[in-house]
Amino acid sequence: MADAVTSQTLADGDRIAVVKFTNISDGTGESSVEKVDISALAASNAGLTPALATIEQIWYDVGGMRVALEWNATTNVVAAVLGGSAAAGNVSGHMDFRSFGGVKNTLASGYDGDIDLTTSGHTNLDHYTIVLELAKNY
């Protein structure tokens, strides 16, 4: 079996994209799974294709596992870690990074602008719901 996962684009405008991810785990988890394909996001009104995204806000509810959001690169770089542990139960919150310009891609060797996700400490029926607000960079 495999984790039951969904990805949904809630908004995809000229400057901002909002995406939502869910997972109900069967205990197998996810490892560096592409969640945001930057090249699949809508082009700007001027016809430019986005090259990178900056994480402006994160809303999350994580139960029983940890979730790492990663900048895809030759060796992925962790952008944020959400959740806690099975002992912590559900951990939810909102992180707003707009006051300082957001969490920017580190441009590590081999970066491509995509955002990946890795879970750890997952067991059967652990779960997450994550919403990202991304600013597109052209």
PLM segments and residue spans:
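Short, surface-exposed beta-strand/loop "edge" segments at domain boundaries and coil↔beta transitions
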Residues: 24-33, 66-68, 77, 120-130
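Noncatalytic modules at the cell exterior or secretory-pathway interfaces
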Residues: 101-127
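C-terminal interaction-tip segments
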Residues: 3-13, 119-138
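Repetitive beta-strand solenoid architecture
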Residues: 15, 54, 63, 109-111
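Short, surface-exposed beta-strand/strand-loop-strand elements in extracellular ectodomains
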Residues: 64-84
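Beta-rich globular "head" domains
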Residues: 34-71
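Solvent-exposed, flexible loop/coil segments flanking beta-strands in beta-rich domains
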Residues: 1-47
